[in-house]
Structures are given as C-alpha cells and as structure tokens.
C-alpha cells in the first residue's frame, strides 16, 4: 500500500500526509491504510479549491488556465494540510477579518463567497452514515459539511453542494480511479474495511475488570450501566435546555445556566481594613549588605568567618536604640538580643581560633524572643477523656487587611537589574543532539537575561538561609545557634563577592514531623527608615545601630543604618521548598520556551535566536490600571521569574485558593474573548470562593488587583 500511495499521489501531498501522521505519533509503515486515507482526503480538499476564484465583481468563476491579466482572489482558503498551530492561526485570522464564528474543530476549507467553513469527508462506507457522524461530532450549524464516497455518491448540508457539477464530477472521477487502482493491486478490500467512524478516544478505550465495576458503581441515580449513561450524555442537544437535563439527573440540582457577557463579570472585591504588612522570611528590597570583594581570608567559605570579615568592613557602629517598637512585643528584649550578638562576636574575635559555629548563651531575652517554655504542655488524650468541658483553644479570625502600595514596589524592584551576577552558567558538556543544542542555547540566552536580576538574588539568598537553618535545626537541636545570612555573587568585572545581610538565631528544633515549627529571630541590616511606612513593619522592632557613609554624585553623605528584628518561624517542609527555590528559574524558562515554541511553529523554524536578539520587538508583560504593559524580551523573562519567586516567598493557603478559584473565572473570560459564548451557573458562588481567599496576604491582594485590571481591559 505504501508503494501505491507514493506512485499514485503528488509528492507534495505524500509529504504533507507524512507530517500529519508524525504530528499524531502514527507510523505510516504500520498504518498504511490511514496513510492512503489522509492522502486521498488532502487531494480532494485541493481539487475542491482548484480553479475556483472570485473576480473583481465578487462573482465566483472557474478559471482553468492562468490569465495574468485577471485580478482574481482564490475562493477557498485551504486549512487542511497545515500543522495544527498554523491552521488555528489561519482560522483565527479568518474569524477576525470576516466575523465568522470560530469552529470547535479544525475545518478543511473556508469559502469566501458563501462566508462559511467547510468540512470535507471522504468515506468508503454509506455517505449518509458518515455525514451523520460528522454532523454529530461538529455540532455546529455554521460549518458546512460535504461528503464524497468512492462509489460516486455525495451528500452535503441542506443539499447545497457549493461547487458546480463539473468540478464535483472531477473529484468523483478521481476517487473512482483510486478505487480501481487499489482493486487492481488487491488493496481495496483491506482499505474499505479499515475505515472507522468519527470516534473519540473514550469510545475506543475499552474499560474492563475492576475499573468497569467502579464505573458502573459511580453512575448518577437511575442509570444501570455505563452504556446507558453514555447514550444519555451523547443525546444531549448542544444548545438544548441544560438546566432541564440537570434536574432530570438529580432532584438536588437546580442549576440555571446564564450567558456570560461582557457586562456580566464584576471586579473582585478587595477587603477593607488597615494596610497589609511585610510577612516574608527575610527582607527583600529593603535589605542592606556588608560585602567583601575577592575574599581570601583564613577560613574563607566558613559562614562565621565570612560574617566576621564582613562586619569588620563597617566602622560606623554606634550605641543602638529603638526607633520603631513592635506593638505587642517586649521591645527591650530585641535591643538586648542585638547587643548580645555584638558582644559574643567580639568574644569570638578575642579567641585564638575562631570556632566554625557559634551557640548563643541562653539569656532571658533570647528565651523570650524564641518562645522557650512558652508552648502549652502536651497531655495524652487518653488521660483527659473524662474532662467534661474539654475543648480546643478559641482562635480569633484573622483581621482583614487592605492592599498597600509597598507590595507593588517590592515586585517592581524584584524585576530590576542589579550590578552583580547571581547565577553562573551551568557547566555542561558538549551537545550531542540537535535538541540539546537548542535547549542549551535557550538556557544561555535566558540566563544572560536573568543572571543580574534582583529576583535571582532573592533565590540565592533564600536557598542559603533555608539550607543553613535546616542544617542547624538538625545538627544542633537544643542550641540557640547563630546563623549568618550570607550570599555570594560576582561583580560585573567577574570578581567574587561575599555579602552579609544580618543574622538569624534559631530556637529549639526537635522537628519530628514535616510541619513541626522551629522559631528563629532574624536581625537584618537596612537603610530604610521604618517610620516612612510603619504599617509595612508591623511585625518588626527596628533599631538604629550605626551611620553609613555613602558616595553619591554630590560627594559623601551619612545615612543612619537600621536593624530590623523580628521573631519568626518555619517548618521542615517550608525549609525544604526554600532550598529548592532554584526551581523558579526552571519554571520561568519553561514559560518563555512555550512562547518561543508558539512563534517557531507559526514560522516553521526555530526562532530562539530572533526571539532574544530582536531588541526592537516588545511583548506583553502584564496588566496595570493603564492597560497592557509591554517590554523587551529580557523584561518579560525577569517579570516571569519575579512572579515565580514571589509565589515561593509568599506561599500560603490564601495564594493556593486564590490561584485555583480565580483561574476558573479567567478561563470563562478567555472563552468570551475567543467568542465561544460561555455560560455559567452560580457565578456568585465562584466570586465568594475567590473573595474568601482575600484576607491579609499582600501578594494575594496584589494579584487580585492585577486580576481586576485584566478584567477591565479584557472586556472593553
């Protein structure tokens, strides 16, 4: 059969059929009848279109010989034979320019004279059976169906055959010839019997054994077996009364399907209340680093040695005092804790040999800050069964918080470039396959765009802090260990740099379960005056600890240096995910890759180089009250990375819930934009589910605000 196909059909048609089978993962050496069927279908589509034009007067004419003087437009747009992405691009373009309704399945042709899509069918069976199967699958009055058979029969929607008698006769003659040629070679019977109906994957997929019994058991009431249920579902009219069907299925259901129009959605309601506060485990845009370049000191790489070396670079220490107290805490204890850190670091420096780790003295201020002996005593449940008024602690509902501008500023800052390189290119051997070459080229381009990004600094800082804290939690369970907050990078000139952001002191850490909590006190350097946005620093006690000389264009100036101190906590599972923050790079690279793939499939060649090197082109980054924001491909990379990093830094049940529920609304809005006429029921319930996730989390509130901007501009 394969030899026959290659002899009988035009090489271009054979090549297109090969590509189509490859795209669907089918082997033409095995599925030879399918190979022949695809070639036949392609040829009929091309013959349907051949010689049909529209002249200047808009009339349909048949021109067999090319007349160079005629200003003619092809009557039919051929969609069949293109790869799926390109085919859908053509369909979307036609819908946009002609106002035609977008079909649910890829049609074969578009008729510019009748302004309709056409589905061509070629069958080896009865034409009316195949026609009904096609109509049942497409379920659209706007796509015209035209079926041909190898016996010369044809059938079309409303008996409207589109083409003139002669053009259709040409197609029928060609099909009859193919049949005769196959019969002469003894191939026809096998080819005729191999045709299957317009099936879906589910119909072909036989369910047997345990799965079959489970399927039969899990049917809605009033259905005895899966076949009955399937037949019932297949009988649903596409535009019939769904509400009635639902109420037939169950007396409990009384859903009413409402059309979803541009005027239907309302903005998500953000909560009122005091402004939200910073809740990340470490400072982001407000962090200050004490740094050493080209570190070569004794013990370089040992965190405590590096920290002491960094501390020595600063000479502006002064007697610390509180500038912004914590509303509920015993603030003098925070001040005493910092003084204790300074004193114990001084003690280390006075020793002959600096130790590798430092356990702090268990002073009253540290015991208070780390919640030592604060946990209620655990009692075995069996010992208190008889207590009549046994109940769980009453816990207050969380206070609602409103969106504050600082979180948008944090995000903007995370997208910016720094003057340091935070990740190196992976050391990978020579590429051995073309796909590896493309993958490493994409990775290298992407790395170049994000290696200087502040979000990448947050990744490396997060990885370091979580790794150090988890190690200390396992290695020194009973100790109040001092953990320097360190990161490493390179300057633009390539010199190595070690940075100190501050210190963590961890509490007792007998972590048996993944969710068991270890308390810690963080002390972080900053030049940000907390009195400018006191609501952001609700959970912090802020000290002024020194004065820093800064060089600027107008000379040297002195700025107060602050220390942001707070009690915090984390768990084994959170630290494990914190150590995995490099995954954010992979996630955002995959998102960029899917953009490149879409572009490449339209252009039918790899577009990686053009994608990254065409600096003049702009891409959509996100929504703001001003509209769709656009930027360079580098800005897109950094924005996607920052979103992924913030999802990690601000991970919470509120974020999980908001992401899952708002996605449903997003899909409905997208369906409306694609003219799919979506319908919804209980839209109010969906809004309720979304809005119950908007409590006090700054990142969730910002995402909800972005979603509202998207709704405004998407539905204009």
Curated annotation (Swiss-Prot):
The keyword Phosphoprotein applies. It comes from the Viruses. Influenza RNA polymerase is composed of three subunits: PB1, PB2 and PA. Interacts (via C-terminus) with PB1 (via N-terminus). Mn(2+) 2 binds at residues 80, 108. Mn(2+) 1 binds at residues 41, 108, 119-120. Plays an essential role in viral RNA transcription and replication by forming the heterotrimeric polymerase complex together with PB1 and PB2 subunits. The complex transcribes viral mRNAs by using a unique mechanism called cap-snatching. It consists in the hijacking and cleavage of host capped pre-mRNAs. These short capped RNAs are then used as primers for viral mRNAs. The PB2 subunit is responsible for the binding of the 5' cap of cellular pre-mRNAs which are subsequently cleaved after 10-13 nucleotides by the PA subunit that carries the endonuclease activity. This is Polymerase acidic protein. A motif (Nuclear localization signal 1 (NLS1)) lies at residues 124-139. Its cofactor is Mn(2+). It comes from Influenza A virus (strain A/Memphis/101/1972 H3N2). A motif (Nuclear localization signal 2 (NLS2)) lies at residues 184-247. One of its GO terms (biological process) is cap snatching. One of its GO terms (cellular component) is host cell nucleus. Binds 2 manganese ions per subunit. It is found in: Host cytoplasm; Host nucleus. Phosphorylated on serines and threonines by host kinases, including human casein kinase II. Keywords: Cap snatching, Endonuclease, Eukaryotic host gene expression shutoff by virus, Eukaryotic host transcription shutoff by virus, Host cytoplasm, Host gene expression shutoff by virus, Host nucleus, Host-virus interaction, Hydrolase, Inhibition of host RNA polymerase II by virus, Manganese, Metal-binding, Nuclease, Phosphoprotein. InterPro entries: INFV_PA, PA/PA-X, PA/PA-X_sf. Its EC number is 3.1.-.-. GO terms for molecular function: endonuclease activity; metal ion binding; RNA binding. Belongs to the influenza viruses PA family. The keyword Phosphoprotein applies.
């Amino acid at each position: 059969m394969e030899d026959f196909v290659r002899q009988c059909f035009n090489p271009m048609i054979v090549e297109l059929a090969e590509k189509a089978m490859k795209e669907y993962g089918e082997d033409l050496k095995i599925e030879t009848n399918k190979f022949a069927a695809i070639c036949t279908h392609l040829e009929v589509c091309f013959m349907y279109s051949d010689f049909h034009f529209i002249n200047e007067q808009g009339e349909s004419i048949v021109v067999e010989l090319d007349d160079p003087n005629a200003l003619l437009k092809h009557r039919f747009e051929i969609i069949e034979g293109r790869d799926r992405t390109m085919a859908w691009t053509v369909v979307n373009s036609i819908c946009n320019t002609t106002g035609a309704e977008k079909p649910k399945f890829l049609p074969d042709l578009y008729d510019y004279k009748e302004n309709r899509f056409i589905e061509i069918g070629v069958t080896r069976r009865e034409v009316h059976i195949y026609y009904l199967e096609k109509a049942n699958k497409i379920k659209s009055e706007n796509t015209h169906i035209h079926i041909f058979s190898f016996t010369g029969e044809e059938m079309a929607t409303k008996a409207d055959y589109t083409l003139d008698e002669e053009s259709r006769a040409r197609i029928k003659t060609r099909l009859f010839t193919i049949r005769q040629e196959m019969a002469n070679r003894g191939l026809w019977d096998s080819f005729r019997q191999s045709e299957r109906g317009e099936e879906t994957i589910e119909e072909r997929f036989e369910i047997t054994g345990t799965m079959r019994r489970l399927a039969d058991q899990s049917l809605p009431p009033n259905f005895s077996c899966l076949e009955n249920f399937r037949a019932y579902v297949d009988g649903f009219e596409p535009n019939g009364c769904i509400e009635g069907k639902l109420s037939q299925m169950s007396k409990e259901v009384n859903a009413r399907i409402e059309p979803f129009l541009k005027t239907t959605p309302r903005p998500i309601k953000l909560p009122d209340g005091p402004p939200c506060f910073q809740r990340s485990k470490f400072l982001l845009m407000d962090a200050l680093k004490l740094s050493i370049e080209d570190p070569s000191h004794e013990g370089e790489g040992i965190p405590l040695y590096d920290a002491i070396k960094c501390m020595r670079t600063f000479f502006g220490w002064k007697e610390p005092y509180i500038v912004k107290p914590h509303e509920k805490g015993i603030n003098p204890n925070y001040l005493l804790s910092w003084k204790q850190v300074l004193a114990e670091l001084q003690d280390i420096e006075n020793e002959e040999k600096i130790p590798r780790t430092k356990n702090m003295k268990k002073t009253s201020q540290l015991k208070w800050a780390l919640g030592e002996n604060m946990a209620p005593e655990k009692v075995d449940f069996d010992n208190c069964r008889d207590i009549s008024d046994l109940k769980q602690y009453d816990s207050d509902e969380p206070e609602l918080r409103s969106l504050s501008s600082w979180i948008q500023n944090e995000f903007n800052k995370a997208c910016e470039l720094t003057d340091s390189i935070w990740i190196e290119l992976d050391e990978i051997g020579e590429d051995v396959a073309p796909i590896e070459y493309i993958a490493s080229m994409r990775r290298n381009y992407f790395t170049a765009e994000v290696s200087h990004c502040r979000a990448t600094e947050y990744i490396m800082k997060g990885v370091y802090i979580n790794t150090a804290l988890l190690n200390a939690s396992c290695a020194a369970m009973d100790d109040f260990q001092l953990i320097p907050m360190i990161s490493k990078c390179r300057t633009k000139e390539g010199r190595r740099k070690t940075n100190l952001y501050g210190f963590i002191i961890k509490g007792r850490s007998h972590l048996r379960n993944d969710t068991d909590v270890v308390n810690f006190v963080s002390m972080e350097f900053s030049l940000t005056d907390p009195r400018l946005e006191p609501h952001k620093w609700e959970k912090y006690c802020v000290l002024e600890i020194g004065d820093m000389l800064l060089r600027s264009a107008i000379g040297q100036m002195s700025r107060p240096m602050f220390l942001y101190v707070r009690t915090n906590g984390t768990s084994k599972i959170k630290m494990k995910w914190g150590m995995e923050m490099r995954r954010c790079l992979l996630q955002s690279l995959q998102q960029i890759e899917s953009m490149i793939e879409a572009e490449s499939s339209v252009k039918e060649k790899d577009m990686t180089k053009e994608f990254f090197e065409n600096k003049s082109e702009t891409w959509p980054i996100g929504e703001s009250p001003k509209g769709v924001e656009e930027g360079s491909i580098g800005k897109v990379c950094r924005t996607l990375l920052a979103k992924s990093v913030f999802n990690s830094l601000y991970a919470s049940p509120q974020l999980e819930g908001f992401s899952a529920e708002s996605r449903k609304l997003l899909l409905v809005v997208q369906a409306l934009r694609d003219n799919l006429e979506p319908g919804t029921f209980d839209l109010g319930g969906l809004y309720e589910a979304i809005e119950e996730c908007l409590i006090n989390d700054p990142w969730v509130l910002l995402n909800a605000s972005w979603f509202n901007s998207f709704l405004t501009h998407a539905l204009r």
